[in-house]
A protein has these predicted regions:
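N-terminal leader/targeting and accessory segments in enzymes
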Residues: 1-88, 257-260, 265, 283, ...
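Phosphate-binding loop of NTP-binding sites
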Residues: 7, 86-228, 232, 236-244, ...
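ATP-dependent carboxylate-amine ligase
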Residues: 1-14, 35-38, 84, 124, ...
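A short, gly/pro- and small-residue-rich
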Residues: 49-65, 76-85, 193-199, 216-218, ...
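Short, active-site-adjacent cap segments at secondary-structure transitions
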Residues: 71-72, 111, 138-141, 181-183, ...
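Acidic, Mg2+-coordinating active-site environments of NTP-dependent enzymes
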Residues: 5, 9, 66, 70-74, ...
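Short, ordered loop/turn segments at secondary-structure junctions
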Residues: 68-70, 136-137, 179, 200, ...
């Protein structure tokens, strides 16, 4: 592709390169740079790509797009925002694949993964369409699974995925869109037919610093979509919509929303309610338990309506949809009189949600096994402890992904959450041993909730990911005869 074609739509401040030059690839990581590439130097959250311009040139980069010009002469192109430019370059390189599909984005603290999976099922079964998915658990093209390690990939990889989806015949792309992705322009230039807002609770304050900043990052989506389907019960929604340019449709249980849930029934086997609009009332049943599932279901129904799918057609699909991996997932414990659940709950509110759900049906104790991630928002650690203290009958405090922090230091930050509580707890630093300890000390009818890892099958320690699948840990301990 000619350099000028690649730079189309990017404001260029200066250029010391022939725009007719043929570019054979694009890289933003100097370690992956190939001869003939355009290297894009970005200022990142953890490092600055400008430090690696010399390395990229040594590896054969034909040109460099940057914000800050290096000293001396070179094949440099300067722009005001190279991160945003990478998103435009990705769309140009892959031929604007998002324009070939109907795009749907889901943002919010909790519920994004469940929402995307439910909506994907409705589009596939009610519309007979092939659907692409980008999410925390995995990326999918139809039924083909593509592993992932972040909620929203870098912008160039997002465009690569869109191209693969479009080429495979996907009519829709449904994606989890994190606040990081919106703030860091990973989806810059993508216009969504529908944007969904689930909720906003404390998370990622290591990055955003304040809840106001966190909300404002989410709000970017609603200046780049046609219809916004938003939680009318969430107190952050008015701020979220302050500068919105989309048509807004609300859903809720408490508010006078466009789409409401009435006659809600919660059970161990799932949820049921009437979905009510100004013109109809349709009974809904989903075989996933938890009060929070009412909201996850409402936002999906609202999005489907915005896409022209009736409540009745959506209801027929939702009644048959299976569990989502790592979300209130039951782990087999044959021959035992206790239950083990795995859930991705890794924020104070999501822990409260899942433990409340378990309390609704548990005949015995609710036992929470949890930790907090290292190198992340420290202020939520005591709140995680308080969530466990308030909503479990016993807690096992352990590690999550400690990353570069000492696990014992993270645990010390969690424990003040138990200060005003009589809830007993045990500290078992090693997560594998913590799970085994909980199983060994389980009582009849206990429900042990392994919080935090969910779909993840690894533990991150000192920049390395080690295999750790909680399903395997449970099975191996059971097989050991313990």
């Amino acid at each position: 592709m000619k350099l000028w074609e690649l730079l189309n739509g990017i404001p260029v401040a200066s250029c010391a390169v022939d725009l007719e030059m043929e570019i054979t690839g694009v890289s933003y990581d100097s370690r992956a740079t190939q001869p003939g590439d355009l290297f894009v130097a970005m200022t990142g959250y953890a490092t600055d790509g400008h430090k690696y311009i010399a390395t990229a040139l040594e590896k054969g980069a034909a040109a460099v797009l940057c914000q800050n010009l290096p000293e001396g002469e070179g094949p440099y192109i300067r722009t005001a925002d190279s991160r945003r430019a990478l998103a435009v370059i990705g769309a140009n390189w892959f031929g604007h694949p998002a324009e070939e599909m109907t795009m749907i984005a889901v943002t919010g603290t909790c519920g994004k993964t469940t929402t995307t999976y439910l909506l994907k099922a409705i589009l596939e079964q009610a519309r007979g369409a092939k659907v692409g998915l980008i999410g925390t658990n995995q990326n999918m093209i139809g039924q083909e699974v593509i592993p992932t390690d972040r909620t929203t990939p870098e912008s160039f990889e997002v465009q690569r995925l869109f191209r693969e989806m479009a080429d495979a015949g996907c009519a829709y792309a449904v994606m989890e869109t994190s606040s990081h992705a919106l703030c860091l322009d990973r989806v810059y230039g993508v216009y969504y037919a529908v944007g969904i807002f689930t909720n906003l609770t404390q998370d990622h304050l290591d990055f955003h610093v304040t809840m106001e900043n966190y909300c404002d990052a989410k709000a970017i989506l609603f200046r780049n979509c046609g219809v916004g389907v938003v939680n009318g019960d969430d107190p952050w929604t008015p701020r979220l919509l302050k500068d919105a340019t989309c048509q807004v449709r609300t859903y809720g249980v408490k508010s006078e929303a466009d789409l409401r849930a009435e006659n809600v029934v919660l059970s161990a086997n799932g949820i049921a309610f009437d979905a009510v609009t100004k013109t109809e009332r349709v009974p809904i049943r989903v075989n996933i338990p938890g009060g929070f599932m009412v909201y996850n279901t409402l936002d999906v129904l609202g999005a489907a309506l915005a896409l022209g799918i009736s409540l009745k057609d959506s209801a027929a699909v939702l009644a048959k949809v299976p569990h989502v991996q790592g979300r209130v997932e039951v782990v087999p414990t044959p021959g035992k009189d206790y239950t083990i659940l795995i859930d991705y709950a890794h924020t104070p509110d999501s822990m409260v949600n899942v433990l409340q759900t378990v309390k609704e049906f548990a005949k015995g104790r609710t036992v929470a096994v949890f930790g907090c991630g290292g190198d992340r928002d420290k202020t939520k650690r005591p709140r995680m402890g308080k969530a466990a203290a308030d909503w479990s009958d016993f807690a096992v405090v352990t590690t999550d992904n400690p990353r570069t922090e000492e696990p014992a230091a993270i645990i010390r930050d969690i424990l003040p959450g138990f200060d005003d509580s009589n809830t007993p707890y045990e500290v078992v630093e090693d997560r594998v041993e913590a799970i085994r300890w909980a199983m060994d000390h389980a009582q009849k009818d206990d429900v042990i909730v392994l919080c935090g890892k969910g779909h993840e099958t690894y533990q991150e320690v000192n920049h390395q990911k080690f295999h750790m699948d909680e399903r395997e840990i449970v099975a191996e301990h059971l097989n050991s005869g313990r």
